């Protein structure tokens, strides 16, 4: 009996703690958190994120998502970006500066930056929200890649090896479905996209367009199959722009 209870408790521990946000029409179910993916090598180079920036993040969340918090809990989405620059240092300094963006604080940031040599840098703790994708900051992890185009990154073997490893590890850790690994340019179609400002609701970027993300997700799915990480179905698009 004791062993049976332990098995039940272990099974429950693998399940997602929170249901998907209400109102999403075609949300992709979470996957069970299992697999054999090891944590990739990650260099911690954290940007300044003191009490003031945390308060700014909480206030931003109140304005745009209706809840005052800076905490990122139970993320459902992983968003791929590129820096539109040629060096890790320039991107890091931009995020560290906390410069006003679109007239608001906090400044933009991402949880990770992958350099051209494949080095993975972590900038922000994974339980803190980062302002990297309008409408998704409340439920997503942001990964930047140093570069100026999707194709440039797709053809850099070292970057792609690191990017896929990191993303797959995050999928395994948080139970994120491959259909919820998206490019920034796909953000408006995510079933998790929520934005209270009508004038911001259709804002997005052109990094990681859908044709290139199809290639990325196909590679990711192949690796997930190899490493025993449930990839699930998807994507299931549910546009929030309008």
What are these regions (language model features)?
Residues 1-4:
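Positively charged n-region of N-terminal signal peptides that target proteins for export
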């Amino acid at each position: 009996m004791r062993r049976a209870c332990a098995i039940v408790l272990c099974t429950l521990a693998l399940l997602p703690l929170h249901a998907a946000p209400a109102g999403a029409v075609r949300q992709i179910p979470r996957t069970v958190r299992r697999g054999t993916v090891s944590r990739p090598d990650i260099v911690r180079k954290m940007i300044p994120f003191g009490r003031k920036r945390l308060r700014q993040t909480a206030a931003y969340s109140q304005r745009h998502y209706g809840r005052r918090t800076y905490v990122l809990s139970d993320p459902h989405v992983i968003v791929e970006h590129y820096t539109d620059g040629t060096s890790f240092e320039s991107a890091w300094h931009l995020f560290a500066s906390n410069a006003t963006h679109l007239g608001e604080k906090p400044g933009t940031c991402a949880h990770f930056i992958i350099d051209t040599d494949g080095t993975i840098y972590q900038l922000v703790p994974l339980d803190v929200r980062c302002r990297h994708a309008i409408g998704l900051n409340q439920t997503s992890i942001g990964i930047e890649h140093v570069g100026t185009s999707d194709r440039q990154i797709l053809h850099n073997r070292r970057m792609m090896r690191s990017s896929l490893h990191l993303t797959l590890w995050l999928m395994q850790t948080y139970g994120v479905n491959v259909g919820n690994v998206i490019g920034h340019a796909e953000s408006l179609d995510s079933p998790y996209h929520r934005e209270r400002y009508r004038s911001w609701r259709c804002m997005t970027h052109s990094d990681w367009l859908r044709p290139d993300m199809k290639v990325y997700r196909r590679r990711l799915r192949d690796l997930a199959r190899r490493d025993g990480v449930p990839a699930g179905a998807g994507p299931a698009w549910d546009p929030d722009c309008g």
